Amino acid sequence: QMCIRDRDYDYALIIGTRTFGKGIAQSVLGLDDGSVMRVTTHRYYSPNYVTPDRSGVLPDLVVDADLADEVARLLCGEAAAESPDVLVLELAGQEWYVHKEAALSADYAPAFAELLSALAPGTPMTLDGESVDPETVSADWETEYVSRWMEDVEDSPYAEEINALAALGAVQGDENGSFLPEEPLTRAELVSLITQAMGYWCWTNQGRAPFTDVSEESWYATAVDITYHLGLVQGNENGEFDPDARIDHQQFITILARMGRRADLKVGWRLDSVTDEELAAPDVQKFASWAREAAVAADSLGLLADDLADIDPNAPTTREEAAAMVYRLMSYSGILTPAAGA
């Protein structure tokens, strides 16, 4: 609870790994024999009306837990004048100073490499007064790091959003480090993407999702189970999940709205306040009736990858569009701290 409070109020720069999502409150009842019973009675919401239930809290900088202390110490270097030996970063609304001598020392070099890997695109950072990026710093200071950014999204209009998620470990590419941004998203890829991005989980005693075409050995089986039990996905009339089917825009936007309602009270309030006048708009009427409320709410909250007028409801959702919309939901709800360039 302290972590999500600090995030919402910008009290601190949060460094480490994602917390386990268990945003619940319990009532403790005293029994006659002196023992107590704990009963889960409420879902916990942050000051920004967001629950960490089932998704946890995503730090500003996602780094190996064993290196988090060292990363924090590096960032707390003494303020200094512009210099080629001092890296100045702006994170969480504050300036942080990393000194070259400390960063390249045997004790801190692994942490410095981890810090460079964790930085999102567009993070304000300077060396000797000149704007730089992690790759430039790595070259200038003659040190190595492993970039988490995707190698094939440079020309994507959503490159900043994709790489911001990648820096957080919220999306991954294939074995070659490629994201394949323009490829249509399948239902199997959908559940995998949103489960990883949001950090979703479910209780093992909830069992398997009831779909007849998802084997327990499938690479996406766990993600299907999780998203089904969270009420985010459904099957067809034959009890099938149809994992290889493509997700069209109106299907994805509907699922995005379900994600938003589950995570953020503000999204739920907007969905519940959609008016008949809004539903009657020509750009909304082209959507199927079951997708219109989601389309109105997502558009008004700035969650869509494009203008509503330019979206074909029946066209396939691409991987880059999906990542951009998930990023915008997470940014709107404060689940992640928006990257400067995204």
Which residues make up each language-model segment?
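Short, ordered coil/turn segments that flank beta-strands lining enzyme active or ligand-binding pockets
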Residues: 32, 47-48, 167, 175, ...
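A short amphipathic alpha-helical interaction element
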Residues: 161-166, 190-194, 227, 256, ...
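Phosphate/pyrophosphate-binding loop motifs in nucleotide- or prenyl diphosphate-using proteins
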Residues: 169, 231
